[in-house]
UniProtKB/Swiss-Prot annotation:
This is Adenylate kinase. GO terms for cellular component: cytoplasm. Its main location: cytoplasm. SUPFAM superfamilies: P-loop containing nucleoside triphosphate hydrolases (SSF52540). It catalyses: AMP + ATP = 2 ADP. Keywords: ATP-binding, Cytoplasm, Kinase, Nucleotide biosynthesis, Nucleotide-binding, Transferase. Residues 122-159 are annotated as: LID.
């Protein structure tokens, strides 16, 4: 069961990735984690990655694909894997295909931009404990105060509206074209493509995933 999750930041991919990992016992492959692990292990690919990153450059598609290929040969990937946050662009998807990395399911989480902005911008955090609130969906008992300590809540830089809107623009420019790319792949019989309504409750989305994945 080889799965790719698509969707804008804040669409709920991370939450559902956790559900899939726990239910089906397959690992999530995050390219950032793979890069760090390879650098730490001092493997040939890791040394190459370190050299590029130390120079302040972006790691090439080829190197990331090589890391993915190496990672999927490991024991915990026997029953499949979950890719979340990769591929991000059509050249990366093409490179995966050329490398012979097959994908069984592509799952798109569809949430309108304004709802994503609402979800993320409303977050408030108690920095010391990591407790997260939401002004609309999970408000603190006292406005802008932590329930336990009474200390001030803050807004993370990543949760500020300008940052969220910038990330959404990047998503629509770079990653959204993958939707039509993988739909064509599904039409050609190379994968199965499902679009899920990410505006629903977490449990409802998880239930639909369980039906799709069996």
């Amino acid at each position: 069961m080889r799965i790719i999750l698509l969707g804008a930041p804040g669409a709920g991919k991370g939450t559902q990735a956790q559900f899939i990992m726990e239910k089906y016992g397959i690992p999530q492959m995050c390219t950032g984690d793979m890069l760090r692990a390879a650098v730490k292990a001092g493997s040939e690919l890791g040394l190459k990655a370190k050299e590029i990153m130390d120079a302040g450059k972006l790691v090439t598609h080829e190197l990331v694909i090589a890391l993915v290929k190496e990672r999927i040969t490991q024991d915990d990937c026997r029953d499949g894997f979950l890719l979340h946050g990769f591929p991000r662009t059509i050249p990366q998807a093409d490179a995966m295909k050329e490398a012979g990395i097959k994908v069984d399911y592509v799952l798109e989480f569809d949430v309108p931009d304004e709802l994503i902005v609402d979800r993320i911008v409303g977050r408030r955090v108690h920095a010391a404990s990591g407790r997260v609130y939401h002004i609309k969906f999970n408000p603190p008992k006292v406005e802008d105060k932590d329930d336990v300590t009474g200390e001030e809540l803050t807004i993370r830089k990543d949760d500020q509206e300008a940052t969220v809107r910038k990330r959404l623009v990047e998503y629509h420019q770079q990653t959204a074209p993958l939707v039509s790319y993988y739909r064509k792949e599904a039409d050609a019989g190379n994968t199965q493509y499902f679009k899920l309504d990410g505006t629903r409750k977490v449990a409802e989305v998880s239930a639909e995933l369980a039906t799709i994945l069996g």
